[in-house]
From Swiss-Prot:
It comes from Bordetella petrii (strain ATCC BAA-461 / DSM 12804 / CCUG 43448). InterPro entries: AlgH-like. Transmembrane segments: none annotated. It holds the Pfam family DUF179. It comes from the Bacteria. This is UPF0301 protein Bpet0561. Belongs to the UPF0301 (AlgH) family. One of its GO terms (cellular component) is cytosol.
Length: 201
């Protein structure tokens, strides 16, 4: 895990794909293996290339609400219950920058398309939400989790993370406190039985 900045622009070069691509997968932190701010985290991997990886923690709500965040950027959000939704801790990199993971993907000025989802970093998606015509489902974070070239692969080799194909329902519909066990259940794992000695799927 690194605190270095990561370019969020998708690269069209097919040669940039890593041997094992973890894009559109969940990383589930293994007990005793992942420490610090990412302990106990479920991370949705938005982009993974030979240059590194970018993901968002999806199970760490903060005390900041969307209404408060919108006020900071001079937008008014009056839609309930959206305005009371929490902003999430997305990771330790660029914690002053907002990231919006949403569905449907829509057409915004700075987005990475992820199948039916998109990661948008431009203000226009928040303006659309304020206007009442934003994406139907979204998760807003401050910060992201970033890895340099080969770092994620190294952590996987050390069994720091379990991996499983991402489920949008867990991202958007499951209560934050239940997302870690829900992600484990995708692998058929009971959280109570999980130990630090297992490998990745």
């Amino acid at each position: 895990m690194t605190d270095q900045n990561h370019d969020t622009q998708a690269d069209d070069d097919a040669n940039d794909a890593p041997a094992t691509d973890f894009s559109n997968q969940f990383l589930i932190a293994m007990p005793q293996m992942v420490e610090g701010s990412l302990a106990g985290s479920v991370i949705y991997v938005c982009e993974h290339t030979t240059r590194g990886a970018l993901g968002l923690v999806i199970n760490r709500p903060t005390d900041l609400t969307l209404e408060s965040l919108f006020e900071r950027i001079d937008l008014t959000l009056e839609i309930r219950p959206v305005k009371d939704s929490p902003v999430f801790f997305g990771g330790p990199v660029q914690t002053d920058r907002g990231f919006v993971l949403h569905a449907p993907a829509g057409d915004y000025s700075s987005s990475i398309k992820l199948g039916d989802l998109a990661l948008t970093t431009s203000r226009d998606v928040l303006q659309a939400v304020a206007d009442g015509n934003g994406p139907a489902r979204m998760l807003v974070t401050l910060g992201y989790a970033g890895w340099g070239a080969g770092q994620l692969e190294s952590e996987m080799a050390q069994n720091a993370w379990l991996t499983v194909g991402a489920d949008a329902d867990i991202i958007f519909d499951v209560p934050p406190e239940d997302r870690y066990p829900a992600a484990l259940k995708l692998l058929g794992i009971d959280p109570v039985m999980l130990s630090g000695g297992a490998g990745h799927a």
